[in-house]
């Protein structure tokens, strides 16, 4: 009975700790909120640099969001800004390919260029 209870507790605590470490990536709540705001409205060059720390610790949820943003990057009017995002996205894709497995394949091919 005690053994079952211990395994049950471990089963709850360990996955939660793993997910938390991926989600937080050492960033404060405000930094994470700022990052998501950047993704939602389009990123400036400065915002891309600020988001880089988060991108280095990407997880599947943020990968899916970033892929969707990349696929719709034509909405970014500034071509320099768009290219900076593409380069940063491609770097992130190379560093964490497994995170993007659920993504749109044609878009992934474009991102890898």
From Swiss-Prot:
Tissue specificity statement from the Swiss-Prot or TrEMBL entry: Expressed by the venom gland.
Tagged with keyword Secreted: yes
Keywords from the named record: Disulfide bond, Secreted, Signal
Disulfide bond recorded as keyword: yes
Source species, domain of life: Eukaryota
GO cellular component terms listed in the entry, alphabetical order: extracellular region
Description of post-translational modifications: Contains 3 disulfide bonds.
Ranges that cross the membrane: none
Protein location: Secreted
Signal peptide coordinates: 1-21
Protein name: Venom protein 184
Organism: Lychas mucronatus (Chinese swimming scorpion)
């Amino acid at each position: 009975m005690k053994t079952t209870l211990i395994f049950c507790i471990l089963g709850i605590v360990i996955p939660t700790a793993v997910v938390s470490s991926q989600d937080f990536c050492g960033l404060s709540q405000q930094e994470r909120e700022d990052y998501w705001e950047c993704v939602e409205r389009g990123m400036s060059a400065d915002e891309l640099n600020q988001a880089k720390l988060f991108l280095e610790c990407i997880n599947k949820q943020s990968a899916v969001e970033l892929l969707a943003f990349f696929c719709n990057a034509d909405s970014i009017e500034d071509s320099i800004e768009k290219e900076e995002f593409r380069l940063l996205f491609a770097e992130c894709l190379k560093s964490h390919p497994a995170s993007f497995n659920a993504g749109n394949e044609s878009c992934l091919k474009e991102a890898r260029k």
